[in-house]
Amino acid sequence: MLIYIHGFNSAPGSFKARLVGARMHALRREREYAVPALPHRPAEAMALLCDLVEQHPGSALIGSSLGGYYATWLAERYALNVVLVNPAVRPHELLSGSLGPQKNLYTGAEYELTAQHIDELRALDVAAVTPGRYFLLTRSGDEVLDYRLAVEKYRGAQQWVIPGGDHGFGDFENYLDVVLAFCGVVD
C-alpha cells in the first residue's frame, strides 16, 4: 500500500495527492493507494494513520509538509520507507505562533488551533532517524519551511534539494517517477 499523508490544513484533494492518485490509476494500482483525510488534532490523525499502517504492513509513505512529520514518526515505529516532500521538521515550534482560528482551504472546516495541538505535535518528535528509510525531496525556495532544517534532520538519507520553487512544489509531477520508484511502486 502507498499512503499519501497530506499537510496542515490540507486534504486528500490536494494537488500532489491527486497527481499520485492519477499515476496509480494509470498503473492500474489505484487499490494500492490511500489518502486518508486527517483530523486536525495530531493525536487523532496519528491514531488513524497507525490503524491504516497496521492494516497494511510494509506500506510505503509519501509525506508532504506536516504529513512528512507524521510520516517520520510512522517510519521509525513501523520500519517503513518514506518520501518526504518539503517536510515540516519542528511544526510544534512553527505553529505555536499561529494559535487561534484556522480554516482548511480544501474542506472549509473551521477549528481552533490550541496549545493542546502543539503539545500533541511535540510528543511526536523523533530525535534521530534511520537515514536509509528516507528520500528527501525539498525546494530551496520553500517560503513556509526552512529546507535546511530538513537537510540536517535527514542527513545521510537520499536527498534532492532543488533550487527555487515554493512550498506547494508545483512541478511535483516531474519527480513522480523517482518518488514511486523509491516507494517500490515502479522500477
Language model features: what each stretch is:
Residues 62-71:
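Gly/Ala-rich beta-loop-alpha elbow adjacent to hydrolase catalytic centers
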Residues 81-187:
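The alpha/beta-hydrolase serine catalytic core
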Residues 1-56:
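Active-site catalytic motif of lipid deacylating hydrolases and related acyltransferases
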Residues 74-78:
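Aromatic pocket-lining residues of Rossmann-like dinucleotide-binding sites
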Residues 18, 22, 72, 148-151:
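Active-site phosphate/pyrophosphate- and oxyanion-stabilizing loops and adjacent acidic/basic residues
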